[in-house]
Amino acid sequence: MAALADAHLQEQIDKAYQKSKKTTNVKLMVGFNRRFAPHIIKMKDLLANHLSPKSILMTVNAGAIPAEHWVHDAQVGGGRIIGEGCHFIDLMRHLVGHKIVDFKATKMGNAPGVDVTQDKVSITLSFADGSFGTILYLANGGSLFPKERIEVFCD
């Protein structure tokens, strides 16, 4: 797999920007793409008439990655929560539609035989409208369990 060099990426961004100046109604989407998935759009539509606070549970069965992999290096990959978990935080914020006002995060404690604990976390977010949600980002789940699951409860 080839990696994009910074210069090449900047060139592509510049081309897209120049093209967008010539064309009307151009949308540029970067990074947080889960909110544009058809099921999420449908979910957002179904929630539109529910103005009461929401309770959300997201389970991410991320799968194990060896401890020596670059994604676990804070200087290179940033860790799995920075690199991937942030997408679920964005998705939850999108579904609630209000600012995050507080959070609590807990990682798995150190235990014999557990090489990486930072990829087994619970993140609870509190929102300005009273909603809350918990993201279970887990690298120790079974492969038969779905990779991503979202449950939303509201009146």
Feature locations, PLM:
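Residues that form or flank phosphate/diphosphate-binding pockets in enzymes
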Residues: 4-5, 38, 144-145
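Generic recognition of short, well-ordered alpha-helical segments
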Residues: 8, 41-42, 118, 147
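Short helix-capping segments at alpha-helix termini
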Residues: 19-25, 49, 125-128
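Beta-strand-loop-alpha-helix segment that lines the small-molecule cofactor/substrate pocket
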Residues: 1-32
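Contiguous beta-strand/loop segments that form the cofactor/metal-binding neighborhood of enzyme cores
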Residues: 83, 90-155
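Glycine-/small-residue-rich active-site loops that bind phosphorylated ligands and cofactors
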Residues: 2, 35, 140
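Predominantly a Rossmann-like dinucleotide-binding segment in NAD(P)-dependent oxidoreductases
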Residues: 26-29, 34-114
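Hydrophobic packing residues within well-ordered alpha-helices of enzyme cores
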Residues: 9-16, 40-43, 135
